């Protein structure tokens, strides 16, 4: 017996901005953005603010990264599709 899939609310406008920044950075530079660069771009006072956005995006399978490794934050296919308007998010 499978449990019913719980539908998540849409991502917040700020989460969409962070996702877009990650995707644009990767497309423009050919390598992944760092947590510090996200903090600087969004003027987050604490690195924890970026981490909270990243974790929320990862729970929705919109970004991925390798913990403990530098420059591994990237959008997933689902994240790219959401930004292209092919998904509700």
Residue ranges of predicted features:
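Short, cationic-aromatic polyanion-contact patches
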Residues: 12, 66-89
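Pre-recognition alpha-helix immediately N-terminal to the DNA-recognition helix
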Residues: 17-24
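Helix-turn-helix DNA-binding helix
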Residues: 18, 49-50
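Alpha-helical DNA-recognition elements
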Residues: 24, 55-56
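Short helix-capping/hinge SLiMs at alpha-helix to coil transitions
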Residues: 24-30
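A short alpha-helical element within helix-turn-helix/winged-helix DNA-binding domains
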Residues: 32-41
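A short, conserved structural fragment
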Residues: 58-68
């Amino acid at each position: 017996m499978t449990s019913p899939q719980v539908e998540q609310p849409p991502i917040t406008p700020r989460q969409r901005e962070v996702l877009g920044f990650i995707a644009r950075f990767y497309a423009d530079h050919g390598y992944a953005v760092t947590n510090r660069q996200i903090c600087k771009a969004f003027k987050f006072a604490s690195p924890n603010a970026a981490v909270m956005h990243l974790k929320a995006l990862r729970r929705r399978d919109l970004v991925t990264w390798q913990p403990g490794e530098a420059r591994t934050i990237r959008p997933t296919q689902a994240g790219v599709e959401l930004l292209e308007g092919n998904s509700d998010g």
